[in-house]
Amino acid sequence: MGPAGATLEAFMINWMLSKLGWFEGNHLQDFTLHKNSGSGILTHGGSIANLTALSAARAAIAPEAWTKGSPKDLVVMGPSTAHYSIARAISIMGMGKNAFIPVPVDENEVLITSALESVYQEQLKKGKRVMAVVANACATSTGLFDNLDEVANFCEKHSLWYHVDGAHGAVALLSEKDKERVRGIERADSLIWDAHKMMRVSALCTAVLYKNYTSQVNTFQQKGSYVFHEGDVIGMDSMPFTVECTKSALGFKLYWSFALEGEKAISDFISNSFQQAKELYNYLSECSDFYCPYKPESNILCFQYQPEILTDEQQLDLRYQLIETGDFYITSCEVQGKRYLRTVLMNPLTQKKDFIALAEKIKTIATSIIKSAVK
């Protein structure tokens, strides 16, 4: 990556740590590992980031796992709606996907924190050790946030590693209007945070952040004379702490995004995107043919068109036909087994007239689908 790229990465990591209260340096160019300071690295996407963070959790509870393999009694608890990369990481680590223990969620797929204790006690009875507890900030499908403070209370009560998947929603830290959504995020032991989601950065660029720098140092225990050298090295070197050997100079594009627009502009973009989702919700809620199951907490909103008439397959067909028009692009997901249309608001030029046009286009396509079904 080179010395300049490594230094810029360390600078931006310090900036992100400072937003969590995990930075103990005198200024962002202070790269000294202070006793109570956090640490982190940038990596290529949330999947690798979750794998890295959970590897740190494993090193904390089972330091011998690096040489002897993952103990068979380790499990990870988290919402049943956790991103698929959590279960994938657990499998990659040799624990098997069944080592992910789902905690019940409510009708909007938000973690039921009151269920944590019973799930935990059940695992103890089975002779299991909980390696980590995962919380969503926010859920990929709905954009809704788990109660991070309540999960933190549970983890602190039982001295469990607390990991927050903040790939999409950790940016709420930068919005004065929305930072309440992530209250308690600073109590986590590890956090992943995508810059390529809502920080105006191209894919891929994800931070893995730790409250305590020793967590990062202990994650990977490996030697290789061609890249790792004994003793201190001159400058910054993130290689001992990442899955990747060679990686892009990720700190550059994150730095230049802020250098070009400034922190306030990025903050305003996030706040505006969250607000757009609320405005779309308000508009669709006034339309009798649309159903929105929840009020958005981020820039993601799920909705259905005439759910009492259109089947899940027809909702999906509606999306395909909408995309084929070339006028709009929306995604789709399942919430509690039901198919929804899903919007992610990220264009600062989006206005109410666009919401109206989207709704009208959906109505036109849906009418055609219904007529075809009758024939």
Where do the model's predicted regions map?
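Conserved PLP-binding catalytic core of the aspartate aminotransferase-like
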Residues: Y291-L322
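Conserved PLP-enzyme active-site core in the AAT-like
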Residues: T32-L33, I48-V217
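Short, glycine-/Ser/Thr-/acidic-enriched flexible segments
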Residues: T81-H83, E107-N108, C138-T140, G169, ...
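Active-site C-terminal subdomain of aminotransferase-like
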Residues: A139, R183-C287
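Conserved N-terminal alpha-helix of the aminotransferase class I/II PLP-enzyme fold
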Residues: M1-G46
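PLP-dependent enzyme catalytic core of the Aspartate aminotransferase-like
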Residues: G5, V335-K375
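Short Gly/Ser/Thr- and Asp/Glu-enriched loop/turn motifs at secondary-structure junctions
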Residues: K35-S37, P71, Y294-I300, E334-Y340
